[in-house]
């Protein structure tokens, strides 16, 4: 059951969605609304224009970048789905901007607009290998500087490439190749439970 505050949030979200569609419809190619959260789908080339407008416009005023999330859909051509989550403190809107890339397309850094993006984009590059153009300090943040590869990609080996361990006999850290090699993985995208659903 909806209480009155949820109805107001939903009504505000509807008004903002109408405003958004009228103003920035040339930048977006998809729209999805869930209660008081709006998700739009954009091209990577239009991203900076749209986010600059949404931050500086007095109606939208998305002044807080809460998080950047990446999903690796290895079966798609544009396998990485990047979602930026914004928050409007005044009107209490949650807002998601989604874009798709194959990892080689240009994704512009939003660190000039939102300072919280500095760490988030570094983490995405470290874990997924997606490079952000015009990011000033794109370097490793969660793995070692000599680490090879990006561990959250679906095609990264489960055991990694090297084994790092402390050798008590020589009192130092050793790096050795992984002794148990993993065979090439083939991904099955079929779901055995699909036959029970319509």
Which sequence ranges carry the predicted segments?
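Terminal low-complexity/charged segments
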Residues: 1-198
